Design a protein with these regions (language model features):
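Conserved ABC ATPase "signature" region
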Residues: 17, 63, 69-87, 196-197
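ABC ATPase NBD coupling module
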Residues: 18-35, 61, 68, 182-187
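Conserved ABC ATPase signature
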Residues: 92-96, 100
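Hydrophobic anchor residue at the start of the ABC signature
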Residues: 106, 134
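A short, proline-enriched helix->beta-strand linker immediately N-terminal to the Walker B motif
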Residues: 111-115
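A short, surface-exposed alpha-helical micro-motif characterized by mixed small hydrophobic
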Residues: 159-161
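ABC ATPase "signature
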Residues: 174-178, 186
Length: 201
């Protein structure tokens, strides 16, 4: 999403190289289509902002609410969508658990109606008891809203559970790619084999 510029290669979205986007309007349109859920739900939410302002940031930037009432309604609906209570909107991030904070991060990503969401290790910082809940929420949202995820993870059992296609990367290089079943059952690269052999039985 151009938080960093690439040093080599291309990143294509809808057939366009995003590293060549120059105008502010084009970048804003791209960022409406592509959102991100960050790994650390503690560091990725501004501790000085209330939840309603965190979630509504994208709504405000893109002019998606015409009145304060419409803004509030959108935020409340997003909170309900991710399993939180609208009354939580006036609280600060420190008042929530890790799992709840990650739900706030998911609501923030959904606020601009994206088509593609990058999930950067979205459950690795959470308690094991909460991880499945967040993954189930992501899967439900995918079905309901027709979302596409790029799910970055090192937990291969979770990757198999959530993925249609898997790409195995090492040192910045894509080693192999295929359907979830193909990579798990017929992965040919030695690095893939070493990852698969490390999964607990």
């Amino acid at each position: 999403i151009r938080l960093y510029d690439p040093t080599a290669g291309e990143i294509l979205f809808d057939g366009k190289d995003i590293s060549k986007i120059k105008s502010k309007a084009d970048m804003q349109a791209f960022r409406r289509d592509v959102q991100m859920i960050f790994q650390d739900p503690y560091a990725s939410l501004n501790p000085r902002m209330k939840v309603n302002d965190i979630i509504a940031e994208g709504i405000d930037v893109n002019g998606l609410a015409k009145t304060p009432k419409e803004r509030e309604e959108k935020v409340n609906e997003l909170l309900k969508t991710v399993g939180l209570n609208p009354s939580h909107s006036t609280r600060y991030p420190h008042e929530f658990s890790g799992g709840q904070r990650q739900r706030i991060g998911i609501a923030r990503a959904l606020a601009v109606n994206p088509r593609f969401i990058i999930c950067d290790e979205p459950i690795s910082a959470l308690d094991v008891s909460i991880q499945a809940q967040v993954v189930n929420l992501l899967q439900d949202l995918q079905k309901e809203q027709g979302l596409t995820y790029l799910f970055i993870a090192h937990d291969l059992s979770m990757v198999k559970h959530i993925s249609d296609r898997i790409g195995v990367m090492h040192s910045g290089k894509l080693l192999e790619m295929g359907t979830s079943d193909d990579v798990y059952n017929f992965g040919v690269h030695p690095y893939t084999e070493s990852l698969l052999s490390a999964i607990p039985l």
